[in-house]
Curated annotation (Swiss-Prot):
It holds the Pfam family ACP_syn_III_C. Disulfide bonds: none annotated. The lineage of its organism: Bacteria, Pseudomonadati, Pseudomonadota, Betaproteobacteria, Nitrosomonadales. Transmembrane segments: none annotated. It comes from Nitrosospira multiformis (strain ATCC 25196 / NCIMB 11849 / C 71). It catalyses: malonyl-[ACP] + acetyl-CoA + H(+) = 3-oxobutanoyl-[ACP] + CO2 + CoA. It is found in: Cytoplasm. InterPro entries: ACP_syn_III_C, ACP_syn_III_N, FabH, Thiolase-like. The keyword Secreted does not apply. The gene is fabH. This is Beta-ketoacyl-[acyl-carrier-protein] synthase III.
Amino acid sequence: MKYARVIGTGSYLPEKILTNHDLERMVDTSDEWIRTRTGIAQRHIAADSEMASDLALNASREAIKAGGIDAREIELVIVATTTPDMIFPSTACILQDKLGIGDCAAFDVQAVCSGFIYALATADMFIRAGKCQTALVVGAEVYSRILDWSDRSTCVLFGDGAGAVLLTGDERPGVLSTHLHADGSQSKILSAPANICGGKVQGKPFVVMEGNTVFKFAVKVLEEVVHEALTENNLESSDIDWLIPHQANIRIIASTAKKLGIPMDKVVATVDKHGNTSAASIPLALDIAARDGRIKSGQHVLLEGVGGGFTWGAALIRW
């Protein structure tokens, strides 16, 4: 049986840092209020000249370098993003060109904050089916472009960044299973309800969110999908060495870990320094934990995320 194994990770954060104290001068909020409710202290903001593909390019180069391969060996590029460079072509196609990769499949996946899990699952299925040997999976966001910077309930939450993983087919277990779900009836609780018609933006092109509803729904479905992954692999929560959740806010992260019986010292949390980077948050956190030596060969790593749509999912990996 062929598995998809992670052979390299990479990440990139824009140079500009926006702290809670900076936000105090922009909207009616405080560092104490933001930290208490979200756990966020700062977030990175892309320069005006930086697009999602630029962030993705930097993260991808790091992953390719870590994987020790030539970029031209990549046969599949998937980018998870809510903030693409343009309407079309896909950010994945733009990234493919910037990497100098020749003819290979390239496309975007849009599942908001669950996007990386969806993209990883798709690449895993390609490799398991024998349709490709090496795949690049990226989560990249310039979420600052779709924020209403006068709305203190949302602008304090998000940041920009990118994370990437390089996968290759192997007989040794890597990605053990992936689990994807969606419930379109909950689409209105987290959205950016706008479209383009006749060259004009129709509706509100900024993030709107029913915070309490999102919190309750997220904790419920994340617990369920994690148990689904554990059951399929005949594991208990105590068998998980590292939980790497979507970095929405520390309350969702801590509540989910508590329900699962996973201590916080087994949870990789970067939300304090990155904020919520949507589809980029999981691969960003994964890269940091891989590079600082926390994740070791043979360990079980559980990724989980939830996002607008409403979408959610999990992936269980043997490192």
